[in-house]
Structure formats: structure tokens, C-alpha cells
Design a protein with these regions (language model features):
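N-terminal "arm"/small-domain region of PLP-dependent enzymes with the aminotransferase-like
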Residues: 1-68, 80, 84
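Conserved core of the PLP fold type I
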Residues: 55, 61-204
């Protein structure tokens, strides 16, 4: 079986990580994977995480299978944290996934299965995996302008103009915070305008946090 498989191109980020590790210069900067590193270049476990793990270790009484949607208690708590308890629980549904990419993949699979969605709108630029997932699933993709390299800020006027071309039942993929790869975020006022546009156009927002 394996002799019929073709070699895939190496991951660009992993290549950069390897090059960084081999670089002997003392003044090098790692701008690759988005994880915190201390002055020694290590990624320590945060004290709050350590403490939480210790509490869980002492209190957890089972590792039995919890079902396809995962831990209901965890889901409710994380939902309250993200939404600041501003939405009625009856309007919320949860399903846990292996990371943000896995969650987006599952959502897009669900959307594709309905056979009712149109194009998926992705920012330009965006995280390359977003386009890769859509290509893998065979879904139609449109891009919308996002980042102005001259001002290093969101070009909201052009973004809004592009998104005006959305049609009913399209999907709009947004970055909830720390836009990848630009780091440029929408202001609260701009979020309000985009939310109104989503309602007016009757499109489905997917927000990658």
C-alpha cells in the first residue's frame, strides 16, 4: 500500500524551526510558532496550568469515555468564559475537537453535508491551513481584503467593500483575536459593523479563536 503514496512537501514552519535550532548566533529571534518563550528560549508550563493540573489530578475520579461531544462540564465553563455568560445556555451547543484546526474542519464538514452553503470567505492574508482545509474538502472559497502593509493595520473600508459581495448562506471565516498572520485586529466598532452586515446578508460566521 505505502509504495503507492507520493511524498508530500515538508511543512514550512517545521523547516524554520529546524533552521532556527541549527543557527548558532546568539542574537537570533524565533518568529515562527506562536508560543511563549522565556529568556532561555524554553516554553515553560504556566504556574496556573500546573496548579490546575494538580487540582484535576487530586479530584478526578474516572477516565471513562465521555462520549463524542466531550466533557459537558468543561464545555459549559469555556462557553461562559468566551461569551461572558451573555447567551442563554439553551441557545448553545458544544462539541470538542482536537484543536482549532480540527474544530474548523468538523464545522466545514457539517456545513458541506447540509448542501446548502455557498462560498466560504477567507481573509487575505490568512493562516495557510484555512485554504488547505477548504481545498481538501472541495469547497468554494472567496477572499476578502484585510491587511494594509503600508499602515500595518486592517483596511476596514476595503474589507467591508469586499464582504458586501457575500450572498445568502455563504460562510464568513473571521479571526476572533490576534489575526494570523498579521496580528491586526478589528476594533469594537468595526466588529459591530461586521455583525450587522452578517445579519443583513444572512451569512454564517465561523470565528476562529
Amino acid at each position: 500500500m505505502f509504495e503507492h503514496l507520493n511524498s508530500q512537501p515538508s511543512d514550512k514552519i517545521m523547516e524554520l524551526m529546524a533552521q532556527y535550532a541549527e543557527d548558532t548566533r546568539t542574537n537570533k529571534l524565533d518568529l515562527g510558532v506562536g508560543v511563549y518563550k522565556n529568556a532561555e528560549g524554553a516554553t515553560p508550563i504556566m504556574k496556573a496550568v500546573k496548579k490546575s493540573e494538580e487540582i484535576l489530578h487530586r479530584s478526578q475520579d474516572s477516565k471513562s469515555y465521555v462520549g463524542l461531544i466531550g466533557s459537558i462540564e468543561f464545555s459549559k465553563n469555556i462557553g461562559g468564559l468566551v461569551l461572558n455568560n451573555s447567551v442563554d445556555d439553551k441557545r448553545l451547543s458544544f462539541a470538542q475537537a482536537p484543536g482549532g484546526t480540527g474544530a474548523l474542519h468538523q464545522l466545514l464538514l457539517l456545513a458541506r453535508a447540509t448542501k446548502s452553503v455557498g462560498n466560504v470567505w477567507v481573509s487575505n492574508p490568512s493562516w495557510p491551513n484555512h485554504q488547505a482545509i477548504l481545498k481538501h474538502l472541495g469547497m468554494n472559497m472567496n477572499s476578502y481584503y484585510y491587511f494594509d502593509e503600508t499602515t500595518c493595520e486592517v483596511n476596514f473600508d476595503q474589507m467591508y467593500k469586499d464582504l458586501n459581495d457575500m450572498r445568502e448562506n455563504d460562510i464568513l471565516l473571521l479571526h476572533g483575536c490576534c489575526h494570523n498572520p498579521t496580528g491586526a485586529n478589528l476594533s469594537l466598532e468595526q466588529w459591530v459593523e461586521i455583525t450587522q452586515l452578517i445579519q443583513d446578508k444572512n451569512v454564517l460566521p465561523f470565528i476562529d479563536l
